[in-house]
Amino acid sequence: MFLYIFVFTILIGIYLLTARIGGCSDKWFFAIVMCVALFVGLSDMLGGYDRYIYAEFFDQVADVSMTVSPDYLHECGIFRQWPGEKGFGWLNVLISFLTSNRYIFILILTVIIYVLLYISIRQYAKNNILALIVFMGIMFFFTFTYLRQMLGISIAWLGIRYIYDRSFWKFVLIILIAFSMHNSALVLFPIYFIPPKRYTINSVLVILSVCLFLGILGVSSFLYDSYGDAFDTERIDILTGSDGGIRFGYFVEAAFFAYIILQNYEVVPDTKKDNVLLNVSLLFCAILLLFIRSENGGRLSWYYAIGVVATLSNIAVYRSQTGQGFTMRMNTFMSYHAFLILLSFFLYFRILRGWGEGGYQILYPYKTFLTNGHRVPDRTFDEYEYDYKYDRDKLYR
């Protein structure tokens, strides 16, 4: 656990060293993001059973690639498992020409995700390191396990710029590519048709209240059933599965983020870009409330998380430009950025601790695939390992 805390602490240190100049240069920031990517990508099947599922499908694709006349669509289970998401299947095929090893495959996928994240933060955030810290609190740990959806999300985030640039077909192209990786990317499509303007606080509160009301009524299952062509039955059951109760965590997260944003509403400049990011962040809150009775429906809000990452970090920059005199501006800046860092750490630590409970300890102790063997105990390995040759030699393929 302490290694993860150390990683977060290092990012805080970098931020404190670069805060006065607005973050790192693009080159240094890229290097930092790649270090985070390697930390995730080199880990030895950490994050849960999803990695084993993707790894087994990839190994099958790699085996087919070695045949004389590969027939991927009929011989590879990945195309039958996700028939509507062939983009991910063909990406597996492409990577199989580079490696047949599942660990290298996961590393390549992770690097792709973080390269796309780097591009998004560079485009949308005023302070790249602070934005990365906020990302760490909200989404970092999901890059360990939800590889396919995170790939779709990181691609979809590239389309945000085409909303405020009003480039419809470029936006559609990005969404279609993301959709081919994970069909849930379709949830980002409606944002293009929301005018890129500032809405009144009262209007925002009304919309959030309506989403909360609909969420309490359990409307999410109905919405998914209406889009049966876009989401397979299994995904509907997973994402809209309800235990019959309200997920209080969704409400707290949505209410807290909405409160911070609305408290600083006037601080954010009234530009197309800032308004789009602002609206995206508020829609993140709205989706959490809409799926407040859903076991995993909150995962749809991840497509809007870049709005929260950019807006919250940008507010810190904008607050430093307000007030009378340098001292007041710096006090305003320091108080908010300290609060934002503490909030990000709380969210980060909450997931870190939560994913270590229940006997699985899917994140720690940390281990890379650079050494053979597996962690003991490791219930995920015991239940989902499909090829024990990897345990004896990580690079045997």
Regions found by a protein language model. Give the residues of each.
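Terminal, non-globular segments
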Residues: 1-397
